[in-house]
């Protein structure tokens, strides 16, 4: 009975596989939004103010960072919790694949969240005259919370690895 239960528990990790595959659909959606933004900007690029172009660029960087985060979670999560990726000898293999444990993944996710939050904060500062001081304060507090959380997670990971 115990062996059956343990095998069932071990096999249940495959429930995560479609979830990781679903993240690729989110990645596709981000790609669509990325190019939608580019196609929206191209016809009016010569009439745009520099500030508006910088804001669009920050939005595109934001989408790119989120996409990278999705790829990292998708591949690393699959390898850590479901099965090792076998992409073949003749195809490109990402250098970090198979090297990120769950602790490293959490730290990379936290760093990505801080980077994404920084982009949002920069967009807020680019439009500071249209945003109330209370909202700016809340954005800053949330960003500082992300930074401190990422720092704490990294520190805890460092002391537990010793």
Swiss-Prot record:
It is a multi-pass membrane protein. Keywords: Cell membrane, Membrane, Transmembrane, Transmembrane helix. Pfam families: UPF0114. It is found in: Cell membrane. GO terms for cellular component: plasma membrane. It comes from the Bacteria. The chain crosses the membrane at residues 15-35, 53-73, 136-156. The keyword Flavoprotein does not apply. Its main location: membrane. Belongs to the UPF0114 family. This is UPF0114 protein Sputw3181_3501.
């Amino acid at each position: 009975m115990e062996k059956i239960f343990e095998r069932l528990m071990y096999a249940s990790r495959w429930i995560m596989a479609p979830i990781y595959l679903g993240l690729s659909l989110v990645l596709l959606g981000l790609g669509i939004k990325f190019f939608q933004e580019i196609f929206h900007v191209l016809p009016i690029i010569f009439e745009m103010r520099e500030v508006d172009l910088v804001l669009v660029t920050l939005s595109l960087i934001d989408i790119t960072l989120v996409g990278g985060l999705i790829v990292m979670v998708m591949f690393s999560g699959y390898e850590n919790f479901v099965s090792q990726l076998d992409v073949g000898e003749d195809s490109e293999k990402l250098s970090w694949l198979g090297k990120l444990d769950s602790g490293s993944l959490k730290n990379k996710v936290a760093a990505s969240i801080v980077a994404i939050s920084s982009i949002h904060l920069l967009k807020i500062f680019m439009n500071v005259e249209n945003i109330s001081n209370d909202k700016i304060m809340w954005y800053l507090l949330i960003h500082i919370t992300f930074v401190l959380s990422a720092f704490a997670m990294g520190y805890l990971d460092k002391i537990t690895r010793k």
